């Protein structure tokens, strides 16, 4: 292999990576370092069908990066790495596209910590570690938020005093932008249309879930807001909720802001509604056996999603297709059916057999021939990051 891009996604206690072949766009090696900060921190590598896990020499990001370098050296892949791409959750309004990393860019990412206090500090740690280990290689940041920077003011502003936007950056930002960009391009190919003439509603459904309106290839609206808490029902996040809940729970239960925020982020969503699990697969199995909480959670999830598909159609302007992606979107034929069956008034008619076939990596159309298309598309954020990195590093063909 002549050339590859190392893609890094750094969390507070984890470091996920993928080595992407520049020519084939295939992942040659992937891995995950987890439990960073704990004594049993370990790293798992997947390469050529083999899976190996080893304890790290120290429980930190630097040790994880050293382990990746050693592994790449062992299998003679280290010299193929020509650039490094970093996933960064929040780029604020400054980063409207991916960016080559220098000290100025890193400082701007640090300024966005207030908008993503759980994510951006870890990204900066990963970036600085990678620069130290690979000082001669170009490094690129690819932002979850940048795709959504094309939203018009009417979509991103909250109806609060404008000084809060001007002075405190209070607005809708959105997440999952790298996934949306990849999936929007793939959807246009499946529909046989140019991307800049394609209007879609795309639902990225995983433990974190969001939905976006794409108008002629650009983001026109999205469900996540200032933070990833707004919008759809998620695994453990509530999604949309009346802000007065904070005052109500403070009075009724003596809860403070931090405990309410924690509850809405970590104890709500599918988990809170079902009182069983945040895992969609477990809930579908339990619901099939008659578990009332599981049935309730899935029903609320599907209704909220269907409602959002309808409202996002306004942002899209027209509906060339509805697209499902992410772990749940790509694999839950049950939830896709529950959503589409509520959207007949938008011209969607489910093809049950096609829907059942689109699981475990199978993409395709899941609606009838005379219906507005609904598509299942497998996202590939790592490839999108690698392609951006190659382009900005001057390595693209």
From Swiss-Prot:
The keyword Nucleotidyltransferase does not apply. Its cofactor is Mg(2+); Mn(2+). It is an enzyme of class 2 (transferase). Its main location: cytoplasm. The record marks 176, 237 as: Transition state stabilizer. Substrate binds at residue 87. The keyword ATP-binding applies. Mg(2+) binds at residues 9, 381. ATP binds at residues 16, 204-208, 279-281, 327-331. The active site is at residue 144. Homodimer. This is Acetate kinase. It comes from Chromobacterium violaceum (strain ATCC 12472 / DSM 30191 / JCM 1249 / CCUG 213 / NBRC 12614 / NCIMB 9131 / NCTC 9757 / MK).
């Amino acid at each position: 292999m002549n050339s590859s891009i190392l893609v890094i996604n750094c969390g507070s206690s984890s470091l996920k990576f993928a080595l992407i072949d520049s020519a084939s766009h295939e992942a040659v090696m992937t891995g995950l370092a987890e439990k960073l900060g704990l004594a049993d921190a370990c790293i798992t590598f997947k390469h050529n069908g083999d899976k190996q896990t080893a304890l790290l020499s120290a429980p930190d990001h630097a040790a994880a990066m050293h382990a990746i370098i050693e592994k790449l050296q062992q299998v003679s892949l280290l010299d193929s790495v020509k650039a490094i791409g970093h996933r960064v959750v929040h780029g604020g309004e400054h980063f409207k596209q991916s960016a080559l990393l220098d000290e100025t860019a890193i400082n701007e990412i640090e300024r966005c910590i207030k908008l993503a206090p759980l994510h951006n500090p870890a990204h900066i740690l990963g970036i600085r570690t990678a620069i130290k280990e690979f000082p001669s290689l170009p490094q690129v940041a690819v932002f979850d938020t940048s795709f959504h920077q094309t939203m018009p003011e009417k979509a991103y502003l909250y109806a609060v005093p404008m000084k809060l936007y001007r002075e405190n950056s209070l607005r809708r930002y959105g997440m999952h932008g790298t996934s949306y960009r990849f999936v929007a391009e793939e959807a246009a190919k499946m529909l046989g249309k140019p991307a800049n003439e394609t209007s879609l509603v795309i639902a990225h459904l995983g433990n974190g879930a969001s939905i976006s309106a794409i108008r002629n290839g650009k983001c026109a609206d999205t469900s996540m807001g200032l933070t990833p808490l707004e919008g759809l029902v998620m695994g453990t996040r509530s999604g949309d909720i009346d802000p007065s809940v904070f005052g109500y729970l403070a009075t009724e239960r003596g809860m403070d802001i931090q405990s309410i925020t924690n509850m809405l982020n970590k104890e709500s969503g599918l988990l809170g509604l079902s009182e069983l699990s945040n895992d969609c697969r477990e809930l579908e199995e339990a619901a099939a056996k008659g578990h009332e909480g599981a049935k309730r959670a899935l029903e609320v999830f599907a209704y909220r999603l269907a409602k959002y598909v309808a409202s996002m159609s306004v942002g899209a302007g027209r509906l060339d297709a509805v697209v499902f992606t992410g772990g749940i979107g790509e694999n839950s034929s049950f939830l896709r059916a529950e959503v589409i069956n509520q959207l007949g008034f938008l011209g969607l008619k489910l093809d049950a057999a096609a829907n059942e076939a689109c699981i475990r990596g199978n993409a395709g159309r899941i609606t009838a021939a005379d219906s507005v298309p609904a598509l299942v598309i497998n996202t590939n954020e790592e490839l999108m990051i690698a392609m951006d990195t190659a382009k900005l590093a001057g390595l693209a063909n």
